[in-house]
């Protein structure tokens, strides 16, 4: 048991370090593109565009959306910024601990009790929990800051969710994952409809009560489709499988079948194979006294689960254990561990409390990253495309990579696309509450400048992702990861050139300039 826990912690550490390295690579490339764009903007051929800067509408800097730091600018430049870097690392570690120790196990128990397949679980509960920071951001934007921070944050990180997280899953997975056509098609269509609805709603810079109700209705229809996903998928496969090879059922020996391990009363280990087309991959079978398909692998939920206060044997692991002990203790006393038999019936409370802590840690993470970017003079354009987008989506990134590394590719992809669909609810719910219960009859004012480019990019990225998966043979591997990474770098390059006014003739400047 101790060896399993150490291996699990090592996997979490490897995933976290790999994600950080990938984000630093993206940040370096995007920053180089920005510097090159500034050089071109200063040339004689681009000076005419700079004359339009005074007439263009300014945007608030990212730092205006958060409280001031606990150091002055000069104190941060004199060395105080190291404290912020340590807080950033600790928040990343905290998010990974919540996801690994509480959030994903609660998702496992929920899926087991409700009989959900991998893709449905990833598109609903996993997407809702990992997108909790966006929901908090949307409520802050409507009720606290009275601005469009929710729109800018959700729309700005949407392309990152689609392309960058998919790239991370493909590049950091140890094995090739097989993808199913129907779940990806279902989620991509739902997200395309959601994006089109948001663009139509905010085109006049005002959101009324029926606009928020429309978004809630779209998400309600999406959830209803998920509830009847088995029947719908069977109909689609029977209707279109003769003309579409990707919808044809795979052989029973393929990787689509998940091994379910159960321990009977005589403690003998038995293995049963069940296709994804069955009613659920987590349902109990007669003759099994204990059944678990762990999101971290085929792990038994033991009565003697490893305590967070047990010290590791090696010195390096002891250092990491001491560093993570405060947050581990905080989570231990505030979140019930549904892996333990006593708390297993409180899995929904575990899920909700995990989402709360994920939101809190992510907010502090993005706050610290924003201050670091402001101190180092990193432009908001580069920050928004890399570190801030990654910060708000770090729960999705960690959760998706973890389940992808265990061979659950459909769950990872459904979480990637499904979390973006849930983000539409993040916009519709606070808008509906504001216009119906708070300021009755008064619309919510939003700023839709520049969203035409963003909306076109979102729709194109959805189409590109689906086509890339199809061309790659419905495999989640390093080739798909490289293609998605290159596409995201291209998107970031075009976005930077657009905001600088090099393309589009519409430079965007900060109000602090």
From Swiss-Prot:
Q: What happens when the gene is disrupted?
A: Fishes show a delayed and reduced development of pigmentation. They display a diminished number, size and density of melanosomes.
Question: Gene3D superfamilies, per this entry?
Answer: NCX, central ion-binding region
Q: Which cysteines are joined by disulfide bonds?
A: none
Sorted alphabetically, which keywords does the UniProt record give? Antiport, Calcium, Calcium transport, Golgi apparatus, Ion transport, Membrane, Potassium, Potassium transport, Sensory transduction, Signal, Sodium, Sodium transport, Symport, Transmembrane, Transmembrane helix, Transport
**GO molecular-function term, one example from the UniProt record:** calcium, potassium:sodium antiporter activity
Cellular localization per UniProt: Golgi apparatus, trans-Golgi network membrane; Melanosome
Q: Which reaction does it catalyse?
A: Ca(2+)(out) + K(+)(out) + 4 Na(+)(in) = Ca(2+)(in) + K(+)(in) + 4 Na(+)(out)
Q: How does it sit in the membrane?
A: Multi-pass membrane protein
Q: Which residues lie on this side of the membrane: Cytoplasmic?
A: 100-123, 170-181, 229-315, 372-381, 442-450, 504-513
Does the keyword section mention Translocase?
A: no
Q: Where are the transmembrane segments?
A: 79-99, 124-144, 149-169, 182-202, 208-228, 316-336, 351-371, 382-402, 421-441, 451-471, 483-503
Any one GO BP annotation for this protein: intracellular calcium ion homeostasis
- Signal peptide (residue range): 1-35
Pfam families the UniProt entry points to: Na_Ca_ex
What does the similarity note say?
Answer: Belongs to the Ca(2+):cation antiporter (CaCA) (TC 2.A.19) family. SLC24A subfamily.
What name appears for this protein in its UniProt entry? Sodium/potassium/calcium exchanger 5
Task: Please tell me the species this chain comes from.
Answer: Danio rerio (Zebrafish)
The protein's gene is named slc24a5
């Amino acid at each position: 048991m101790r060896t399993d826990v150490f291996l699990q912690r090592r996997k979490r550490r490897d995933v976290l370090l790999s994600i950080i390295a990938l984000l630093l690579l993206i940040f370096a490339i995007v920053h180089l593109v920005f510097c090159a764009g500034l050089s071109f903007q200063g040339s004689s051929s681009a000076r005419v565009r700079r004359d339009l800067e005074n007439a263009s509408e300014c945007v608030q800097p990212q730092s205006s959306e958060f409280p001031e730091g606990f150091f002055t600018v000069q104190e941060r430049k004199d060395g105080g910024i190291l404290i912020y870097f340590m807080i950033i690392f600790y928040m990343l570690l905290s998010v990974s601990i919540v996801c690994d120790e509480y959030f994903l196990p609660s998702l496992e128990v929920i899926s087991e009790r409700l009989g959900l397949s991998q893709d449905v679980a990833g598109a609903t509960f996993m997407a809702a929990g990992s997108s909790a920071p966006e929901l908090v951001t949307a409520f802050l934007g409507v009720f606290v800051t009275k601005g469009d921070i929710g729109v800018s944050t959700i729309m700005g990180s949407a392309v990152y969710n689609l392309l960058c997280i998919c790239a991370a899953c493909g590049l950091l997975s140890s094995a090739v994952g097989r993808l199913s056509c129907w779940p990806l098609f279902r989620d991509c269509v739902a997200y395309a409809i959601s994006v089109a609805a948001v663009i139509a709603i905010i085109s006049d810079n005002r959101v009324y009560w029926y606009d928020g109700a429309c978004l809630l209705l779209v998400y309600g229809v999406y959830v209803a489709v998920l509830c009847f996903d088995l029947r719908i998928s069977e109909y689609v496969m029977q209707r279109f499988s003769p003309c579409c090879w990707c919808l044809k059922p795979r052989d029973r020996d393929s990787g689509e079948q998940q091994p379910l391990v159960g321990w009977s009363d005589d403690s003998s280990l038995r293995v049963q194979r069940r296709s994804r087309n069955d009613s659920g991959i987590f349902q109990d079978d007669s003759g099994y006294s204990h059944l678990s398909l762990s999101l971290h692998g085929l792990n038994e939920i033991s009565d003697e689960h490893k305590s967070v206060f047990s010290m590791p044997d090696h010195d390096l692991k002891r250092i990491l254990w001491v560093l993570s002990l405060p947050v581990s203790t905080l989570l231990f006393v505030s979140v019930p561990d549904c892996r333990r038999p006593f708390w297993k019936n409180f899995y929904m409370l575990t899920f909700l409390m995990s989402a709360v802590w994920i939101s809190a840690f992510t907010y502090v993470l993005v706050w610290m990253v924003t201050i670091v970017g402001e101190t180092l003079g990193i432009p908001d354009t580069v920050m928004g495309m890399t570190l801030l987008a990654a910060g708000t989506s770090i729960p999705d990134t960690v959760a998706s990579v973890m389940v992808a590394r265990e061979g659950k590719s459909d769950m990872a992809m459904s979480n990637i696309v499904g979390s973006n669909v849930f983000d539409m609810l993040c916009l519709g719910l606070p808008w509906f509450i504001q216009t119906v219960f708070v300021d009755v009859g008064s619309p919510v004012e939003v700023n839709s400048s520049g969203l035409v480019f963003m909306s076109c990019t979102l729709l194109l990225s959805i189409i590109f992702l689906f086509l890339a998966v199809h061309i790659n043979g419905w495999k989640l591997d390093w080739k798909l990861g490289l293609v998605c990474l290159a596409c995201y770098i291209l998107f970031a390059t075009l976005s930077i050139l657009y905001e600088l006014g090099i393309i589009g003739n519409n430079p965007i400047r900060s109000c602090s300039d």
